């Protein structure tokens, strides 16, 4: 994937091929290009899938639309298994897994085994996202410490703690109304300050009307302040509700993550399948847009490329001159000669890249191509001296050529 890359700059085979909608797909494409197949059956299955997707543009664009909405399920699933996943990442799974699973179900009956297998892997147990739907608020914060991640409906205790945390003033007013009605003291007030905490205040004249369970907390010039067991309980819970709700929320969140982690293998399999579908769609789109054709796989050693083009160079120039290349039992070597900048290296690279693309499962930039079995590819293009080890440029070149000849089959 470093084709025509100048010190990491400029277009590469990967950069021109990467039409993937997801980060997972881009990583998978890089793996396919770096690790081409050797099995004719597996490679043909990829070609069949690319051909089918290429011929159905509406479905291809629908696939891209679904994939484009996906988060990085692979990375999120890994963080779930490690217990380091963030609330918004879990929410992104909750929001997108139903659509992904529905797409998988629609593909599971495909007549193509590769597509059907991808569909089955993408079809997930609804229990995964249903549990997330029940447990998470609609828009959780970025970090758990920010609070309000778990839905109050999940835990009566959490709901009560948040009730005390957020509605202390209303709780005091409700108690004030109840106590006024119970005692008949219309001037009774239930209040709070940082010095005295929570208290019931009555005027001096009404102090003798308070019930027996009122405990005197403070005597002032014009009023008396009392506390009751109920108010003391409210005080304790209100003052500690923030810390306790945060601790309980973390406990519930950790439990949710642990339950989700049980489905990590399914999530990773679905992510892998989605990435494969993404690559196949990207291959199909690139082939459709650039007039690439399906290569034919042969059991005979050799290759026959008609009007082959360099997949990177053709994107940079308008009038690319295609070339043929044929190698077989009676024609196992070509010696290519020509002036500097005459296209020798580009020609050799185009042949190598067409072979690589073939066994990666892609269509190729050629009018036709028949490619035999390939077990390895060696290149030696460009060299410089190695004075530190006493090797001239010529010596470096000959050493590299010798290494190629030793390992060639």
Question: What does each model-found stretch correspond to?
Answer:
Residues 1-342, 346-378, 400:
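Alpha-helical coupling/stalk and coiled-coil linker elements that connect catalytic or binding modules
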Residues 376-409:
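Switch/coupling sub-region of P-loop NTPases
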């Amino acid at each position: 994937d470093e084709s025509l890359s100048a010190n990491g700059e400029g277009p590469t085979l990967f950069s021109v091929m990467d039409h993937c909608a997801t980060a997972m797909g881009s990583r998978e494409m890089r793996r396919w290009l770096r690790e081409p197949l050797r099995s004719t059956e597996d490679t043909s299955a990829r070609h069949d899938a690319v051909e089918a997707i290429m011929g159905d543009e509406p479905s291809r664009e629908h696939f891209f639309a679904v994939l484009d909405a996906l988060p990085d399920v692979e990375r999120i699933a890994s963080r779930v298994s490690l217990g380091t996943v963030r609330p918004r990442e879990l929410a992104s799974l909750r929001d997108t897994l139903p659509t992904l699973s529905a797409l998988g179900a629609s593909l599971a009956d495909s007549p193509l085994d590769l597509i059907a297998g991808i569909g089955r892997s993408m079809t997930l147990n609804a229990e995964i996202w249903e549990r997330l739907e029940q447990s998470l608020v609609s828009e959780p914060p970025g970090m758990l410490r920010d609070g309000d991640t778990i839905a109050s409906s999940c835990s009566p205790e959490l709901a009560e703690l948040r009730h005390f945390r957020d509605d202390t003033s209303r709780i005091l007013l409700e108690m004030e109304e109840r106590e006024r009605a119970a005692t008949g003291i219309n001037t009774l007030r239930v209040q709070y300050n940082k010095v005295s905490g929570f208290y019931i205040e009555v005027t001096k004249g009404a102090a003798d009307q308070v019930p027996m369970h009122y405990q005197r907390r403070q005597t002032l010039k014009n009023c008396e302040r009392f506390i009751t067991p109920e108010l003391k309980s409210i005080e304790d819970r209100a003052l500690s509700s923030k810390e306790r709700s945060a601790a309980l929320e973390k406990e519930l969140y950790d439990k949710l993550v642990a339950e989700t982690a049980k489905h990590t293998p399914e999530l990773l399999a679905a992510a892998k399948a989605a990435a494969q579908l993404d690559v196949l769609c990207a291959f199909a789109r690139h082939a459709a847009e650039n007039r690439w054709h399906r290569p034919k796989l042969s059991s005979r050693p050799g290759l026959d490329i008609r009007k082959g083009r360099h997949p990177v160079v053709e994107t940079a120039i308008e009038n690319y001159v295609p070339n043929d290349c044929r190698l077989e039992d009676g024609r196992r070597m070509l010696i290519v000669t020509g002036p500097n900048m005459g296209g020798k290296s580009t020609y050799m690279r185009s042949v190598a890249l067409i072979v690589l693309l073939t066994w990666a499962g892609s269509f190729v930039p050629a009018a036709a191509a028949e490619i035999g079995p390939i077990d390895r590819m060696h290149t030696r293009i460009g060299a410089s001296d190695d004075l530190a080890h006493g090797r001239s440029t010529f010596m470096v070149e000959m050493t590299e050529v010798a290494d190629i000849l030793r390992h060639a089959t």
